[in-house]
Amino acid sequence: MKPIDWQVAARDGNARTGILRTRRSVIETPVFMPVGTQGTVKGVRFEWLEQELDARIILGNTYHLFLRPGPEIIRQLGGLHKFSTWNRSLLTDSGGFQVFSLTDLRKLTEEGVEFRSHLDGSKKFLSPEVSMEVQAALDSEIVMAFDECPPGDAGFELTKKSLELTARWAKRSRDRFDELQTNGMDSGLLSVPPTTVGGADLSGRQALFGIIQGAGHLELRKESLERTVGIGFDGYAIGGLSVGEEKSVMYDVIEFTAPQMPDDAPRYLMGVGTPEDLIEAVHRGVDMFDCVLPTRNGRTGGAFTSRGRINIRNAKFATDDGPLDADCGCSVCRRYSRAYLRHLYQAGEILAATLISHHNLAFFLDTMGQVRQSIKLGRFSQFRLDYLNKLRENDASGV
């Protein structure tokens, strides 16, 4: 049995909608994946994500779960699904992006990356092989290859050197992943064989995605794409964007890269982005997204609405008895006013962050639902124009 099944259902220009099936859920694409860094989407209960918001897939963070509680504990407790009680699909990143953001705390070699934990300063090591082993322990449906993410403004030579390392690491990731899926866990890092966890056979249960790098250099993006596809993966991701480059550069890279990616595999844009970014990336052929913005902004009073972003801390909302977004049908918008949410935030109540994060996730997931419907109807181009024009109303008014 294949670990995932992917079929394109409809197209409108480069935009496409499809069905991604895993062992745990059927996922309609384009899809936004809430980020569950520590095995939880910050401030939001899984019941809400599953029952109200109908999120079919979320992200787990290999770096953070590697450090705490550790793969051995998660393996012993039956994998991240059982440990966290998340019942639907999981995609885990490789840990590469987080490690390479620790510029002053890491040492890069051909073998992998030695770094100091941001928790206690202890020395740790991640390599393609270790990353695959940790993600096997997490038992996610989709595993990401281990890569190096250069800065967005990296020069050509530095980016090319990084790309070549990423290509070698991609092959090592593929080889170790295949060993684990075929033979089970035989590494000294993790002592519990996959076939004994919860009485389930884990062989062949995960899919592996490769990552295309190259910063803003289109020639290198093409080379990375060709080398990654040459290795062969179940899906392909565009990495190394939204890391400081100009937005126009990001859009140029997506527009150049996405249409050249295999048509018969999901296309994933990592770590991006705003609602506008999602719409523009779908327009250029992307299927999958993740970003921390809905919950990160929610914790600081930032709400995404159909007319642009607002900050509930603004004094103008002190007596506003309207919902966060009149066009949103989420439980937060049906029940609570802007004035009440502002009061909660000003009072330092934890509930404020939870409610605004919940709304933001509902907004992102609903946006993707509207995108899918417009593609099916052959109306995505008009939807894109109308959506973006409406989205800029508050931004233009300075709210």
Predicted regions and their residues:
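Non-catalytic, usually N-terminal nucleic-acid engagement modules in DNA/RNA processing proteins
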Residues: 1-184, 201, 315-318
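C-terminal extensions of enzymes
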Residues: 1-21, 27-34, 42-43, 147-153, ...
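Conserved, mostly hydrophobic/aromatic
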Residues: 25, 58, 93, 135, ...
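Short acidic/polar active-site loop segments enriched in Thr and Asp
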Residues: 55-56, 141, 234, 287, ...
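Non-membrane alpha-helical structural segments and their capping/turn regions in soluble enzymes
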Residues: 125, 129, 156, 160-167, ...
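Glycine- and acidic
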Residues: 151-156, 160, 235-241, 350-353
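Glycine-rich phosphate/ribose-binding loops and adjacent secondary-structure elements
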Residues: 164, 180, 203-209, 213-324
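Intrinsic disorder/low-complexity segments
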Residues: 180-204
